[in-house]
Amino acid sequence: MGKIIGIDLGTTNSCVAVLDGGKARVLENAEGDRTTPSIIAYTDDETIVGQPAKRQAVTNPNNTFFAIKRLIGRRFKDDEVQRDVNIMPFKIIQADNGDAWVESRGNKMAPPQVSAEILKKMKKTAEDFLGEEVTEAVITVPAYFNDSQRQATKDAGRIAGLEVKRIINEPTAAALAYGIDKKQGDNIVAVYDLGGGTFDISIIEIDSNDGDQTFEVLATNGDTHLGGEDFDNRLINYLADEFKKEQGLDLRKDPLAMQRLKEAAEKAKIELSSTNQTEVNLPYITADATGPKHLVVKITRAKLESLVEDLIIRTLEPLKVALADADLSVSDINEVILVGGQTRMPKVQEAVSNFFGKEPRKDVNPDEAVAVGAAIQAGVLSGDVKDVLLLDVTPLSLGIETMGSVMTKLIEKNTTIPTKAQQVFSTADDNQSAVTIHVLQGERKQASANKSLGQFNLDGIEPAPRGMPQIEVMFDIDADGILHVSATDKKTGKKQNITIKASSGLSEEEVAQMVRDAEAHAEEDKKFEELVQSRNQADGLVHATKKQVEEAGDALPADDKAKIEAAMSAVEVATKGNDKEAIEKATQELIEASAKLMEIAQAKAQTQGGAQEGAAKQSNATADDVVDAEFEEVKDDKK
């Protein structure tokens, strides 16, 4: 059985880890980095992922997608999506099913389809390290992701060619990474996870006793649309406003300028974590009739903190709710762990420290802990990690709509999963022959104020006065936090059941089509890679042959030289095209045309060998007797 890998599919950066010799190991990607920017770009002829995509974003802003995780499993009309529509340089559109999709070069794409490109890169990174195909993964999601967002993440995995063995909450994964080596005692840990696009707080009890470890999530809370991207946007807007005040031009109308501004804002934010002042200097950011314009703005740490103060305060309310749900006070928390790149900001650390009355731990890597935890969970599932029990919870209450548009809860938030719950309902009207089961997720009493997960009908109910039929509704949440619902007429035994797919979401056919598309692209990518290899080999051969022709000098007959030069020209022409077979044919013809060159080189090597042997035997030879040129040529030959 192949390895199950652990993937942190982040809003800003993603990371992959595997168990190696019993320890979780974070893997370096092809660029040599341990984290990969969650950025995908589409050009005329290829899809670019990670750092290369980030580098070309300034020149291709409309087709470079970032923070796609903020759209996954969401409806276009959601308030959070509408906020992003106005600030993202790329196009966010409404799909036929009401979901938020994106558009590039006329192609409409679902967020899981775009996210799958990042997962494919993570998969390839793991395969390069392991030397074998990878088909299974544990993927992390924010603890506060709802059912639709979890389903969409699983869809992304399938499109990338991965069977998602488990969806695990990010703070829980971080706690696993932190606690796996803590062998004794009972600790209550608060995991404060402020990433690129989402915020979570989880209160987790780690019980380590005689080699057995239990990680039990006591409560979780958060905000799935609050993170480092929002901090960046505050700074971007400030810079744009300052420029408008000074120059009278609104950079928000220029996607190219906004992409440069985004890069500069992110860089300035990072710098202000270690310095008190920085300067954003962007020459030629735009131009008008009077000529080019430059943006130069000094920003202090205090200014940045004032711009984002309310965002930091927003993270504190979920902390209070999570503690109350766990029936704990601040003094009950033994350790505080910070996860997510945005927690590197000193003001965030200060706010967390003040809230809990203790300094957060500094021995957990905020960028890698989640992927490490995912790899450990993968090890638990494969049997490589023993004596670890993980008890996670459902973040939001689940129920159905009942009479008067009320949400009746069947499973309360923070219930340990997997779990089941059932309740008997009845009809609202006399002789009602069918009921609609409308499944909801959320904490509000009013049904319409909660997230609709989907609905289905149970028909064939025998005519009876209202309140008489007995309809048993069962909710079953699996270990991924995904809901399965059934409704049974207790009298007739008629049953209807579904795995909740969001009222939006991708259909099975759409996912299957996207999987096929991804497989087709994989074949294209393989062919492209083989073409590049053939080109490189051909270029290398031409370079080496030119050098040998020069070294052979007059020893190479004129007709052989003409043949070789013609063959080299043919290779150079072939490498400019995209026909791999033509390149390989021209390369082979050059090898054959160079046969005489090889003979000359071998003869020369033998002559040089003899000369050296003779020189060694001359006991009275002086240094001047040694022919330097011959030694130099031997060195070159060895190269």
Swiss-Prot record:
Signal peptide interval: none
UniProt feature, compositional bias: Low complexity: 603-618
Source organism superkingdom: Bacteria
Amino acid composition bias (Acidic residues), ranges on this chain: 625-639
ATP-binding as UniProt keyword: yes
Phosphothreonine sites (modified residues): T198
Molecular function in Gene Ontology: ATP binding; ATP-dependent protein folding chaperone; unfolded protein binding
Record protein name field: Chaperone protein DnaK
Organism encoding this protein: Shewanella sp. (strain MR-7)
Encoding gene per record: dnaK
